[in-house]
């Protein structure tokens, strides 16, 4: 007889190799055929809603690792929620207006100037839709489950119409105004920028100290002094109209040779050192407030510079006397407005100085620094010139420096509802908790929001102007424009005359001749995506406002979290979200930012093509995503190893359940052995731990819990000793069916627990599980932890056994290294445990040699009675020797009963019995 044919070895068609790059697309096709998204919505219909609102990625180019991290995290949450009593719809979105698309078309050779605005915008829309399609396929390949056929896209007419409504509502409340004000201006984009479109980079700049002679000392100064200002932007000096000092600071009149200079007293030593003064002496001090309304002369123009008081003046750098140009700075503008100064801005859209800067007109602002400095030297006003490298704002798209420039722009007044914004921030749940402080400070400190852009590709600002220049924004005009956009899209604004965009028969007192013109500026793209709570959450039947969660990268505190909050609070008085969760950026393996120049860019597509989407998803679950995260080939190799372990666990479980019918073979919990019940306790602990981790969005805890359960609880313990029963005993042996009962519960629970993270693998495992009826594991719920009555006692006892077992394993390892034994089944062990452990061992009814995977087990005396040369561990001393007897051909146990049964000379007594009872006819 071939004894190997009497072993019940694992049998399954579930493949050992994942081959995910090939298998996943096939699984995704299957999901598409069965309409898995709709099926899940149907299955969860009527449950409480959980809405995670998708922040729209920008529709340009392939998805990068940041996109992958973001979408996969969202997918974890949505999938988990739909398996825990919620209906969790997920509507993906795209942000589709803005400069990058205009630039992409220019790079493709589109001649913008040779076509109408409407024609150019049509090309922009076509390009945007192509990009949406491209990214949609890549997101699907990640295994993200979403309403892919019905996304929201910011260029779609229905969306634009709602955005116009948001603008109209804000205007109605008096929050929208037009004003001349310094804004971030990008000469390279020829447009105003919002704060969210700025990034800081190092820049080399001239650093100059300039003397402004006093013209009128107002009886505080004698008139022969000079104010010293410091600036790193010499090109703004033609726009200088004043000098700001702090009312509370003390100012010194410093005599240096024959000159007298005015600086802040506490900066005396710093300035003296910088300007290399010798024998400088302070001849008088005055309070800043006393200097108000004194007058200085502009260094090279025949005009005055008024001395004003400003709280923005600090002693962090410079001289305490601040060059003030209301056309080129926020603080300058505010102070200048208070003192009635004009807003002089002698720089045009392209960053070129105009005739309002005589002597420098026609020069690009950066190129004007040198001639202006030379002019200062010529007139004797330049006290010092050096160069410094400092952090300076740049256009996030063109990567070129920006300037502050006063222009006529449309603004949303944040000041008008700042208090409500701060209250909304306080009512929101922030993860990580520092997010609250971050957004609170941003809202507290931010100026009014410049919402106009001087570009073509975007949603037009729906304002008309009367003949007398009055802006027209009424309910009637807003609703009419919104209806036109809903029907024709926003291109209609550029295709029709103003009169054809107004309601029929519209009149206005400012237009006696019935003539009107329309605004040509478009809205900031942050106003587009920031209106999604209205256009998507409020408008879609399957969603609701506020959303339960917004989840984006930490750069969105100043971006989408901020703009969404501003428009929502302005329109509804409430935040658009109940909770906000943010993640960090993806860096390379060494913690460096990814860049083309370093050549360290990791692309999601490459990972999916080589390893598979589930490996990428498993990586996402493994990292502490609330900080910046790292990815590299080595890191992915480790993750792939963990995946292999999880997959092999599934395969082993399936293989050993091939002949198990849950309806017929399940053993009642009360009839299970203690060790089996202990395994159920461990499983229930896992279920509880994993669900708690999912609830708190702690996916790394899910990853580690599942990995540890597979390697430590299953592979190293339960499955290891179970083989001796599963393979060796007869099919219906009670111990075998008991273990299978536990394995079945483990398999079903484990498959469900990994579903949010490894959906492809979970749905691949699912149909192989005996007795399941659902078409997909996604149509099931998370497992419930079942509390066993004696769970605590089992845990105490068997956890103690596991620590003792560790000591035994160490002893076996030593014996193996010393060649006392080959494998552990060659061993006979005698234990000399502590009193506590001895009592525990004596209370165990199981076959202990089986649990230790040795051929012979004896319990000796107490630990102190152990032979002197026996290795002693924390809980026991262990004597390891060769087991006596021969090795059984069938179970490989060393036994003295080999050949006792004459018909089966090479088998031990146990195997001979099994073979006779089950295989001999």
UniProtKB/Swiss-Prot annotation:
Which cofactor names does the annotation list?
Zn(2+)
Give the comment on domains.
IleRS has two distinct active sites: one for aminoacylation and one for editing. The misactivated valine is translocated from the active site to the editing site, which sterically excludes the correctly activated isoleucine. The single editing site contains two valyl binding pockets, one specific for each substrate (Val-AMP or Val-tRNA(Ile)).
Motif 'HIGH' region is found at: 57-67
The yes or no answer to whether the keyword Ligase is present is yes
Task: Determine if Cytoplasm is one of this entry's keywords.
Answer: yes
Q: What is this protein called?
A: Isoleucine--tRNA ligase 1
Task: Tell me one GO biological process term.
Answer: isoleucyl-tRNA aminoacylation
Binding-site residues, L-isoleucyl-5'-AMP: 552
Q: What quaternary arrangement does the UniProt entry report?
A: Monomer.
Query: Which reaction is the catalytic activity of this chain?
Result: tRNA(Ile) + L-isoleucine + ATP = L-isoleucyl-tRNA(Ile) + AMP + diphosphate
User: What are the protein's GO molecular function terms?
Assistant: aminoacyl-tRNA deacylase activity; ATP binding; isoleucine-tRNA ligase activity; tRNA binding; zinc ion binding
**Looking at the record's lineage, which domain of life comes first?**
Bacteria
Species of provenance: Bacillus thuringiensis subsp. konkukian (strain 97-27)
Q: Which family does it belong to?
A: Belongs to the class-I aminoacyl-tRNA synthetase family. IleS type 1 subfamily.
**Location(s) in or outside the cell:** Cytoplasm
- Enzyme Commission (EC) number: 6.1.1.5
- Looking at the UniProt entry, the stretches that span the membrane are none
Q: In chain numbering, where does the motif 'KMSKS' region fall?
A: 593-597
Give the UniProt entry's GO cellular component terms: cytosol
The residues the record assigns to binding ATP are: 596
Residues annotated for Zn(2+) binding in this entry: 888, 891, 908, 911
Say what the protein does.
Catalyzes the attachment of isoleucine to tRNA(Ile). As IleRS can inadvertently accommodate and process structurally similar amino acids such as valine, to avoid such errors it has two additional distinct tRNA(Ile)-dependent editing activities. One activity is designated as 'pretransfer' editing and involves the hydrolysis of activated Val-AMP. The other activity is designated 'posttransfer' editing and involves deacylation of mischarged Val-tRNA(Ile).
Q: Which SUPFAM superfamilies match?
A: Anticodon-binding domain of a subclass of class I aminoacyl-tRNA synthetases, Nucleotidylyl transferase, ValRS/IleRS/LeuRS editing domain
UniProt entry keywords in alphabetical sequence: Aminoacyl-tRNA synthetase, ATP-binding, Cytoplasm, Ligase, Metal-binding, Nucleotide-binding, Protein biosynthesis, Zinc
What Pfam families does the database record attribute to this sequence? Anticodon_1, tRNA-synt_1, zf-FPG_IleRS
């Amino acid at each position: 007889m071939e004894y190997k044919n009497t072993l019940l070895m694992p049998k399954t068609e579930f493949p050992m190799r994942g081959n995910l790059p090939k298998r996943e697309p096939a699984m995704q096709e299957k999901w598409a055929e069965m309409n898995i998204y709709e099926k899940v919505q149907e299955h969860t219909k009527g449950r409480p809603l959980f809405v995670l609102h998708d922040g729209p990625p920008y529709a340009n180019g392939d998805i990068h690792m940041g996109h992958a991290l973001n979408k996969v995290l969202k997918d974890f949450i949505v999938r988990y929620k739909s398996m825990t009593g919620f209906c969790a719809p997920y509507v993906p979105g795209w942000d589709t207006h803005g400069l990058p698309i205009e630039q992409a078309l220019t790079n493709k050779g589109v001649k913008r100037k040779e076509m109408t605005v409407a024609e150019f915008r049509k090309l922009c829309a076509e390009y945007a839709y192509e990009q949406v399609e491209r990214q949609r396929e890549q997101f699907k390949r990640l295994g993200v489950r979403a309403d892919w056929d019905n996304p929201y896209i910011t260029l779609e007419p229905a969306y634009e119409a709602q955005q116009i409504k948001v603008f109209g509502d804000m205007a109605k409340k008096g929050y929208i105004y037009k004003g001349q004000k310094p804004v971030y201006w990008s000469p390279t984009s020829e447009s105003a920028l919002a704060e969210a479109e700025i990034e800081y980079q190092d820049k080399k700049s001239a650093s100059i100290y300039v003397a402004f002679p006093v013209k009128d000392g107002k009886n505080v100064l004698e008139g022969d002094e000079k104010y010293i200002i410091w600036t790193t932007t010499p090109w703004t000096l033609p726009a200088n109209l004043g000098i700001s000092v702090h009312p509370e600071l003390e100012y010194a009149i410093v005599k240096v040779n024959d000159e007298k200079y005015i600086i802040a007293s506490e900066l005396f030593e710093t300035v003296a050192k910088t300007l290399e003064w010798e024998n400088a002496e302070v001849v008088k001090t005055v309070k800043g407030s006393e200097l108000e309304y004194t007058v200085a002369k502009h260094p090279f123009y025949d005009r005055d510079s008024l001395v004003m008081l400003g709280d923005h003046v600090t002693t962090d750098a410079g001289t305490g006397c601040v060059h003030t140009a209301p056309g080129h700075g926020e603080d300058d503008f505010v102070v200048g407005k208070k003192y009635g100064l004009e807003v002089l801005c002698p720089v045009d859209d392209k960053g070129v100085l105009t005739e309002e800067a005589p002597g420098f007109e026609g020069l690009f602002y950066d190129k004007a620094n040198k001639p202006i400095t030379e002019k200062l030297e010529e007139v004797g006003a330049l006290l010092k010139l050096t160069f410094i490298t400092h952090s300076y704002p740049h256009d996030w798209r063109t990567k070129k420096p920006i300037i502050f420039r006063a222009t006529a722009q449309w603004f949303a007044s944040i000041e008008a509802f700042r208090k409500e914004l701060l209250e909304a921030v306080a009512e929101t749940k922030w993860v990580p908790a520092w997010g609250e402080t971050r957004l609170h400070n941003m809202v507290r400190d931010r100026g009014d929001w410049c919402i106009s852009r001087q570009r073509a590709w975007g949603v037009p600002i729906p304002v008309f102007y009367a003949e007398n220049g009055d802006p027209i924004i009424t309910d009637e005009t807003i609703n009419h424009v919104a209806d036109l956009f809903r029907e024709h899209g926003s291109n209609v604004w550029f295709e029709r005359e103003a009169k054809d965009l107004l309601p029929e028969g519209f009149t206005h007192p400012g237009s006696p001749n019935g003539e009107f013109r329309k605004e040509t500026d478009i809205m900031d793209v942050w106003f587009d995506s920031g209106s999604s709570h209205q256009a998507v959450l409020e408008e879609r039947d399957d969603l609701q406002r506020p959303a339960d969660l917004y989840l984006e990268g930490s750069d969105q505190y100043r971006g989408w979290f901020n703009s969404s909050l501003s428009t929502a609070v302005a329109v509804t008085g409430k935040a658009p979200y109940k909770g906000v969760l943010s993640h960090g950026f993806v860096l390379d393996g060494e913690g460096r930012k990814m860049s083309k120049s370093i050549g360290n860019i990791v692309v999601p597509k490459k990972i999916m093509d080589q390893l598979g989407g589930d490996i990428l998803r498993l990586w996402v679950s493994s990292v502490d995503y609330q900080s910046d995260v790292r990815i590299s080939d080595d890191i992915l190799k480790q993750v792939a190893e963990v995946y292999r372990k999880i997959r092999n666990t599934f395969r082993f479980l399936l293989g050993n359940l091939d002949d198990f019918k849950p309806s017929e073979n399940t053993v009642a919990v009360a009839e299970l052995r203690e060790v089996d019940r202990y395994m159920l306790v461990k499983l229930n602990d896992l279920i509880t731990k994993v669900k708690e981790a999912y609830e708190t969005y702690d996916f790394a805890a899910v990853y580690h819990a599942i990995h540890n359960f597979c390697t430590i609880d299953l592979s190293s313990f339960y499955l290891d000793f179970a083989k001796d029963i599963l393979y060796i005993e007869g099919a219906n042996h009670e111990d075998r069916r008991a273990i299978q009962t536990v394995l079945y519960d483990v398999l079903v629970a484990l498959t469900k627990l990994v579903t949010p993270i490894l959906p492809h693998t979970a749905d691949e495992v699912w149909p192989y599980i005996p007795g399941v009826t659902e078409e997909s594991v996604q149509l099931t719920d998370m497992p419930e932890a079942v509390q066993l009555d004696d769970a605590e006692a089992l845990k105490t006892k068997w956890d103690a056994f596991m620590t003792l077992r560790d000591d035994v394993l160490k002893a076996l390892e030593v014996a193996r290294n010393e060649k006392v034994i080959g494998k552990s089944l060659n061993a006979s062990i005698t234990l000399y445990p502590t009193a506590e452990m001895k009592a525990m061992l004596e209370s165990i009814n199981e076959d202990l040699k089986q649990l230790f995977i040795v051929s012979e087990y004896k319990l000796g005396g107490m630990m102190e009675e152990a032979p002197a040369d026996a290795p002693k561990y924390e809980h026991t001393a262990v004597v390891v020797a060769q087991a006596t007897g021969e090795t059984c051909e069938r179970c490989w146990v060393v036994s003295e009963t080999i050949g006792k049964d004459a018909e089966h000379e090479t088998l031990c007594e146990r195997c001979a019995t099994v073979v006779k009872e089950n295989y001999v006819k």
